[in-house]
Amino acid sequence: MKIVFAGTPDFAAAALDAILGAGQGAGWTVSLVLTQPDRPSGRGLKLLASPVKQLALAHGIEVHSPVSLRKGDAAATAHARLRAAAPDIMIVAAYGLILPPAVLDIPRGLRDGWKPKLSAINIHASLLPRWRGAAPIARAIEAGDVRTGVTIMQMEAGLDTGPMLMAEQVAIEADDTAGTLTSTLASLGARMVVAALRNVDQLHAMPQPAGATYARKLDKAEAWLDWGDAAPRLQCRVRAFNPFPIASSMLNGATIRIWSAHAVDGPAIFDAREIGLVRAADALGVRVACGVGELLLTELQRAGGRRVTAREFIAGFAVKPGDRFTHPSTVATE
C-alpha cells in the first residue's frame, strides 16, 4: 500500500509516526508528504519546518509544501507530484489546506466497489458532526463540553462532511487545556488510523447525523477576556486558549497573559464599575470579580516576561485589591 500523508502540526506528526512504525511490518510505504510551508518562528523569526516535515525528512521521505492545491502553478505542480507518487490512499490530519475534488481523485482508492472510492481519509479531532472545521479541540473546551473524541472519516469536497468510518470518545477533564487535550487526541488518532489501515475490509461508511456545529479558526483578538462574562465561561476560555492565543487582559497599562485560572463562587455584579476588580491577591492567586462569580488567576505572564505563579506575579507586579483588569477597548475609552 502506497500512502501520501498530508498534515502539519504535532497532532498530525503523531499519526505519521504511527503509520511509519506500523508500516514496517504491514508493507505500507509513505511515498510523499504534503505539509504547510516553513513559517517564521520565535523572536528571531527564523523559518521553522512543521513537525510533520521534520519527521518526514528524518525518515528520508519526499516532502512538498504547496501554497495552494486549488489554482495556479503551485496547484499544478502539487497535482503532478501527487500523480507521480501513485498513492493508493491519502491520509490527512490537520493539514491546513482544503483538498479539492481533483486531488481526492488522484489516489487509486482502497476497497474496490466503494462509490465514491475510498481515496482519502481524514483524522478529525472531534466527534462529528460536532465541531467541524479548523479548531475543534479549543472550541469543545470553550463550549464547556465534557466529552470529545476522534473521528476517522472518508473525505469529500465539503468541510468535514464525509461519511464516518470510525469514532472513539474521551472525557474532557476539568483541568484539560487545548494543549493537553491535543496530546490525548493525537495519541488516540494515531492508534485509530493504524487500526483503520489494518482493517480496511471491515470499515463501514456511516453518514453523519444532523446537528453539525462549526469550529471556526482561533483568532488572536479572541484572547482578550470580557470580565462581564460569568467566571465558569471565562475559565473555559482560559483553558481553550492555552497554548494559543493565550487569554489576555490589561492591568495597570500592561498586557497580562493568563495561563491558568479557576472559577470560584462570588456574587453577581450589578455595578459595572466592579467588573474586573481585583478582590484579593494572596498565596492562592489573584481573585477577579466577573459578571457572575470570580476568577482565581493562578499562572500569569507579563508581556516580555516569563510564565510565573500567582505568588511570583503578585510580588513582582505589586498587584493589590482594588486594581482592575480591563479589556483594551475599555482602556481606550477611559
Language model features with spans:
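One-carbon transfer enzymes
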Residues: 1-245, 302-304, 309, 319-334
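C-terminal active-site/capping subdomain that shapes the small-molecule cofactor and substrate pocket
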Residues: 235-334
